[in-house]
Amino acid sequence: NTLGGAGAEKALLELLKRFPKEQYEISLYVLLDQGELILQVPSHVKVLNREYSDASVLSREGKKVLNKKIWKRLWIHGAVFRNFPFLIRNTVAMIKKGKISPDKLLWRVMSDSGQVIREHYDMAIAYLEGGATYYVHDHVNADRKFTFLHVDYGFAGYTRELDKNCYPDFERIFTVSDEVKKSFVKAYPECSKDTYVFHNLIDQKEI
């Protein structure tokens, strides 16, 4: 969703490095157009974002940039209005459970206000749960679609209602550990045969 300096984002960069540039044409779209790791994206990867900030999402200045961007995105394509019933319904559900997660509510809006990409792809991969998964599911035209999960699905606050039951539509679902897989399959038992464990790749030299 961003390219900040966290573990999942670093693992994504390592994965991009592993694809032979002679065999694959790779494009990358970062949903929230921000993160310092953009400077480390392999040169053969085409970055689709028309605008981008390399400010760290953890820095004071970077947080200002990100918050301003999120506020602006609420109104693009009428995303917040289109999702208003969804936001109300899921906010009420969260209140009943005693835990409100604003970020989970906003992912759908951020997905629907993302950049319009008209190209058709052989394969599209959402590397993070939440906004990236929703964006690939709803707005990317591709023959095959895969997605990744890096967090305990239930503990993180995700629900089928928040997802709009999008996961069964993915051909493959990759989780970064057996524990993450177990949590996800508990929520989506029908996806068990299409869910695989794919451990994060690590740059041994960097360590």
Tell what function each PLM region has.
Residues 179, 201:
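Carbohydrate-associated surface elements
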Residues 8-19, 33-40:
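Short amphipathic alpha-helix
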Residues 21, 118, 138-142, 164-169, ...:
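Short, conserved loop/helix-junction motifs that constitute active-site signature segments
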Residues 1, 128-129, 149-152, 199-200:
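Histidine-centered beta-alpha loop that forms part of the nucleotide-sugar donor binding/catalytic region
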Residues 125, 169-178:
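A short beta-strand/loop micro-motif in the catalytic core of glycosyltransferases
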Residues 131-134, 142-159, 172:
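A short, histidine- and acid-enriched strand-loop-helix "catalytic/donor-clamping" loop
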Residues 102, 112-129:
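Short N-terminal targeting/anchoring amphipathic segment
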Residues 24-98:
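N-terminal strand-loop element at the rim of the active site
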